[in-house]
Design a protein with these regions (language model features):
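N-terminal, active-site-proximal structural segment of metallo-dependent hydrolase catalytic domains
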Residues: 3-136, 140-151, 155-160, 349
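Beta-strand-turn-beta hairpins that frame and shape the catalytic cleft
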Residues: 48-58, 70, 159, 163-173, ...
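Active-site beta-strand/loop signature of hydrolases that rely on acidic residues for catalysis
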Residues: 56-63, 93-123, 166, 199, ...
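Solvent-exposed loop/turn segments at secondary-structure junctions
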Residues: 65-66, 115-118, 144-148, 171-172, ...
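Surface-exposed cleft-lining segments at the edges of enzyme active sites
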Residues: 80-86, 114-116, 179-188, 214-222
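Short proline/glycine-enriched turn/loop segments at secondary-structure junctions
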Residues: 153-154, 186-188, 301-307, 331-335
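Metal-dependent phosphoesterases centered on the DNase I-like endonuclease/exonuclease/phosphatase
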Residues: 219-320
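Low-complexity, intrinsically disordered Gly/Pro/Thr-rich segments
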Residues: 322-333
Length: 349
């Protein structure tokens, strides 16, 4: 065998091994893909049985798996990081987030990006920590559950996390309602499966329906639209039953008529825009634009807001029988997460 043939043979073997490894990976990801049903019951832990008195306070906060504080950036936003450099970074952020919840008491807390067992957050069970710290009833719905995410370099690896609702109220039932998935195979095998976490609380013969949400981020825009449409269909159906509806979280879309935070970064991620006409008559957004609710993670946060891309993408939707007293963004200056919490105060009418 000539030298040239030996070289070609070695190259062929290497290519065959690479193809085989890719095939094995695709088979593994396909077999282990998280495939939740359209509606699934969610367990509620805790013993609190408090009933609503008509006055309700809800706090929503995307905690960024306690891995996206002021010193972190994120590769999908134009940064370079996949996870914090040290486990202590996550622990410090998580402690700060927990203290924020204790210092701002609410009847219900909608948490997004709460990890349970993920490489990116050093396998810390953040949901368990926050539930134990607050002493509230807890319900968790996974929206990201992958045995292995094989990108970028270094790889994300295992992810288990999702939506966490903490509440003092006695929850009659909780469910995970699946939202449309915009991704196709094989990308879908290790990507997010967005959902609503719905908690039902009895109130004067009807239900207070608490809806925790986190809509699509890194899609072409069609996923956000489809998920928003399904969200509104669900909310209006609940209101037509006579229920009180409070939906809140990270919409990954800016709210109508907010111009305080113009686009200064046109190269990286940008949110969608919610349609000003999407709400039926009597419904309303509850949003506070006096402070930003989110920052772009193209780099660590320097504190210079004029040079930081800011957004208002976190807030609430209220049914007509829920009266808005106030809504306030708690400006923590992105100390522990890339989002600021938002506090809602309402009356059930």
């Amino acid at each position: 065998m000539t030298k040239a043939k030996r070289v070609l043979r070695v190259i062929g073997i290497i290519l065959a091994v690479i193809v085989a490894l890719i095939a094995v990976l695709l088979i593994f990801l396909t077999v282990t893909e998280y495939k939740p049903g359209p509606v699934e019951e969610v367990a509620v832990t805790g013993t609190s049985g408090k009933l609503p008195d008509g006055h309700v306070r809800v706090l929503t906060c995307n905690i960024g798996y306690a891995g996206l504080g002021k010193n972190q950036d994120f590769f999908m936003d134009g940064g370079s990081m996949v996870r914090p450099a040290e486990k202590t970074d996550v622990e410090t952020n998580l402690q700060g987030i927990g203290n924020t919840l204790l210092e701002n008491p609410a009847d219900a807390v909608f948490v997004q990006e709460a990890d349970v067992d993920s490489h990116r957050s050093y396998n810390i069970d953040e949901a368990e920590y926050l539930a134990g710290l607050t002493g509230k009833n807890a319900a968790l719905a996974y929206n990201f559950k992958a045995a292995f995410v094989p990108y970028p370099i270094p790889m994300i690896g295992k992810v288990e996390g999702g939506l966490l609702t903490l509440t003092d109220y006695g929850v009659e039932s909780a469910s995970r309602v699946a939202l449309p998935v915009p991704f196709k195979w094989p990308v879908s095998t290790c990507n997010l499966k967005r959902c609503l976490l719905v908690c039902r609380v009895p109130y004067e013969g009807r239900e207070l329906v608490l809806v925790n949400l986190h809509l699509e981020a890194y899609d072409d825009g069609e996923g956000k639209i489809a998920q928003t449409n399904m969200l509104m269909d669900f909310l209006t159906e609940e209101y037509e039953k006579g229920n009180y509806v409070i939906a809140g979280g990270d919409f990954n879309q800016t709210f109508p008529d907010i111009a305080q935070y113009p686009a200064i970064d046109t190269e990286n991620w940008a949110p969608g825009v919610l349609d000003a006409d999407m709400l039926p008559e009597g419904w309303q957004f509850a949003v506070d634009a006096s402070s930003p609710t989110c920052r772009l993670l193209s780099g660590p946060y320097t504190g210079d807001r004029e040079q930081t891309q800011l957004y208002v993408i976190d807030g609430f939707i209220l049914s007509p029988n829920v009266f808005l007293n106030s809504v306030q963004t708690l400006d923590l200056d992105f100390e522990y997460a890339d989002h600021n919490p938002v506090m809602l105060d309402v009356e059930l009418q």
